[in-house]
Amino acid sequence: MVTSVRGRGDIQVCSTTLQAGVGRVEVSARTTYAERRSPLDSASVVDRPVAGRGSPVAPAVDRPHRGAYPAQPSSEPAAGLALANLTRTFGTRTVVNGLTLTAGAGQVVGLLGSNGCGKSTTMKMLGGVLAATSGTFTLDGAPGGVGALGVKARTGFIPDVGGLFPRLSAWEHLELCARLFAVPNWRMRGAGLLADLDLDGATHERAGEFSHGMSRKLSAAIALLPGPGLLLADEPFDGVDQAGVDSLCTLFSGAAARGAVVLVSTHLLGVAESLCDQVHLVKAGSVLAAGTPADLAGSGSLAGAYQRVLSARQHAGR
C-alpha cells in the first residue's frame, strides 16, 4: 500500500489494503465469555453514545452451546473456514506442514502452540499477506489467497506485530479503515470499540506513543470495525493486561455470536480453555491433536493435555 501522511487528518491512500484491518487474546476461571455482553452487537455499539462511559448495559447475546452449530444443506458450500494441506516453506525449511482443519461459522477456534510452531505463518497465509507454497483454504466455499480480494474484504486481521501507522491517532486509524471498507455508522461503532478496550482516553494520541498492549488493542479495534466474516487474531493477548484480555475475549465471542469464524493463535492455554469452542494443538507446523478444550483436557487442564500429547509424540518418534 502506498500511503502519504501530510499531517494529522490529512491522509492520501493509493491502495485498498490496510494490514491492521486487512482487506487485511491468563484467565484463572473457566468462564464462558459468550455469557457476557457483546460490545459489538449492533444494538449495543451502533446506538451507543460516543462518550462510551455511563452507557446502558447492552443486552446479552445468546450463543449456541459448543458444537451445537447446525449442519449446512449439502447443496450449498459449507459455511466457515476450511484448510486443506496448507503448507509453507522458506528455502529448505518447512514452517507449516500440510495443515488441515475446519472452523465452523460462529465458532472460536484456537491454534495453540509454543513460539515458532507456525501459528503466525498460518495467519499470514489466511490473511492473504503471504502466499502458501501448496495447499488451499476456503471461506464459505470461496477460495482464499493473496489475490482473493473477495475473501480478503471479509477478513479482519490482527497481526502479531506491526500494522499501525506511528503518526496516525487511534481515531484516524479507524477512519482510514472505515473509508477503505465503507463501514456504515463507523463513528459510533468505533467510539464504542475504543471504550470497550479502554482506549477512549487515548482517542487522539498517535499510535507511535502507545504501549505494546495499547497497540494490540487498537489493532483489534481496527480488525473488528467492519464486522468481518473471518477474524484472525495472532497472539492478540501479548502485552495486554488482564482487563484488556477479558475485553478482547468478550469482543471475540461477540463476533462469533454474529456468525463470524474467529481463529485465535496463542500460547496462553488458560485463555484458550475458557474462550475457544475447538482447539488445535500445533507443533512444527502440524496439528498434533484437536477437539474441544474439555475433551482434550479430560479431568486435568489443557496445558497438561498439551504436554501429554508432546510426550507421546516424542516417544513415538524414538
Ranges and model annotations:
Residues 231-235:
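Catalytic Walker B motif of ABC-type/P-loop ATPase nucleotide-binding domains
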Residues 135-146, 151:
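Conserved ABC transporter NBD signature motif
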Residues 175, 179-202:
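Conserved ABC ATPase "signature" region
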Residues 127:
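Helix-to-loop junction immediately C-terminal to a conserved catalytic motif
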